[in-house]
């Protein structure tokens, strides 16, 4: 049994759901049709019954702890999932350290950012999530991180370029939301969603990033890959070794086909599951 907080989750069911989730939204939103994989978009979930809600909360808590272990959420990043077939989302709370968050800490809010349940307080920046969910029906999960290397690009005029094969999914660009501070009003949430457009990630100037996916597993893996690519680019640009040459469109199409398949997403998700399990035992 895999446990998160007080709610047990069977490991086989958990991984089955993760694999199904990874199959969703595998094509980068603004990549051309020729560059996209053929896997379907959408959520693997069809019903929002109580059992599914508990499992979703457990997955949010686990993903948050894993992001904390990777050092990219800090003290106040958060993860959310849309409850399929409803106007509600589940999101991590404001008032719990990210490396100890449990199933019972996750709260429910509606798309107007009104908290509906939960013993904890919703994030001050719930509008990061609800703003994007209102604008993007294809998005089923959002990760808000505070990644060091990615945020560095939010204060320069240089864009994040695909310089790592895992960065190919961001070849259509990572825009910057040009507002400094918390995204804590409907107007700011809507503005962030407009800045994101149909892309996979957006930087919050001098602040963080919001990464979207058709499943929690996909949003999680994309968040990791955004920071990997940003680190690679900064290292290359500051090495003094010469001009940085990003991927060609042909490179992008090939790398997406090779490394953004459902099996590839699941492999990376499983790696972080195992890494988290080892860290938890240490």
Model-derived segments and spans:
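N-terminal secretory signal peptides
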Residues: 1-10, 33
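Glycine-rich flexible loops
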Residues: 16-29, 35-282
């Amino acid at each position: 049994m895999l446990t998160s907080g007080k709610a047990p989750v069977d490991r086989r069911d958990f991984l089955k759901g993760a694999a199904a989730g990874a199959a969703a939204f595998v094509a980068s939103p603004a990549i051309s049709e020729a560059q996209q994989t053929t896997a379907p978009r959408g959520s693997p979930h069809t019903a929002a019954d109580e059992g599914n809600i508990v499992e979703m909360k457990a997955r949010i808590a686990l993903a948050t702890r894993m992001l904390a272990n990777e050092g990219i959420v800090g003290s106040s990043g958060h993860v959310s999932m849309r409850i399929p077939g409803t106007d509600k989302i589940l999101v991590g709370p404001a008032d719990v350290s990210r490396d100890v968050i449990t199933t019972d800490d996750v709260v429910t809010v509606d798309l107007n950012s009104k908290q509906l349940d939960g013993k904890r307080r919703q994030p001050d920046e719930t509008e990061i999530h609800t703003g994007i969910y209102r604008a993007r029906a294809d998005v089923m999960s959002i990760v808000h991180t505070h990644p060091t290397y990615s945020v560095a690009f939010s204060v320069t005029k240089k864009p994040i370029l695909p310089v790592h094969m895992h960065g190919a999914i961001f070849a259509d660009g990572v825009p910057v939301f040009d507002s400094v501070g918390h995204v804590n009003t409907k107007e700011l949430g809507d503005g962030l969603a407009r800045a994101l457009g149909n892309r996979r990630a957006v930087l919050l100037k001098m602040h963080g990033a919001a990464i979207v996916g058709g499943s929690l597993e996909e949003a999680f893996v994309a968040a990791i890959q955004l920071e990997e690519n940003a680190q690679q680019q900064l290292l290359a640009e500051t090495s003094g070794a010469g001009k940085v040459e990003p991927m060609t469109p042909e490179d992008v199409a090939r790398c997406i086909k090779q490394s953004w398949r459902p099996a590839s997403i699941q492999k990376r998700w499983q790696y972080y599951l195992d890494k988290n399990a080892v860290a938890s035992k240490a």
